[in-house]
Amino acid sequence: MARMAVLWRKMRDNFQSKEFREYVSSTHFWGPAFSWGLPLAAFKDMKASPEIISGRMTTALILYSAIFMRFAYRVQPRNLLLMACHCTNVMAQSVQASRYLLYYYGGGGAEAKARDPPATAAAATSPGSQPPKQAS
């Protein structure tokens, strides 16, 4: 229990230090904090249909994050929080790109169309509709 109290005091002292306050009020903190929206949105969209994925935008986001991942590492002082954000975004967008490729070029779209009946057949068999009259 004494170790926990010591750890708690160290954390509290660190959070109250001038260096921590300066870090939290800098762009090295807030830039990555807001940039986490990109990978979080990509992770959220992984459950959505692959029809909504834009191949061009996904490619652009992969290249953008790869370039800025290198920038975050090379800038002085190194911004490892931003680098982690861009690394996560590259991985998330790569998953989205693979879903896009499988759907449009791997036959996933054709299978989805084969499963769904055409709209005219669905309308004809909808409840409350009358069967077509036969010619006599």
From Swiss-Prot:
Lineage: Eukaryota, Metazoa, Chordata, Craniata, Vertebrata
The species this protein was found in: Homo sapiens (Human)
Broad class of the protein's primary localization: mitochondrion
GO molecular function: pyruvate transmembrane transporter activity
Keyword Transmembrane tagged: yes
Stretches the record annotates as Disordered: 111-136
Role description: Mediates the uptake of pyruvate into mitochondria.
InterPro entries attached to this UniProt entry: MPC
Compartment(s): Mitochondrion inner membrane
Domain of life: Eukaryota
Name of the protein in its database record: Mitochondrial pyruvate carrier 1-like protein
Bias type Low complexity, positions: 117-136
Keywords: Membrane, Mitochondrion, Mitochondrion inner membrane, Transmembrane, Transmembrane helix, Transport
Similarity-based family: Belongs to the mitochondrial pyruvate carrier (MPC) (TC 2.A.105) family.
Gene: MPC1L
Ranges in the topological domain labelled Mitochondrial matrix: 2-19, 75-136
Segments on the Mother cell cytoplasmic face: 43-51
GO cellular component: mitochondrial inner membrane
Biological processes, Gene Ontology terms: mitochondrial pyruvate transmembrane transport
Membrane topology (UniProt): Multi-pass membrane protein
Record field: catalytic activity: pyruvate(out) + H(+)(out) = pyruvate(in) + H(+)(in)
TM segment ranges: 20-42, 52-74
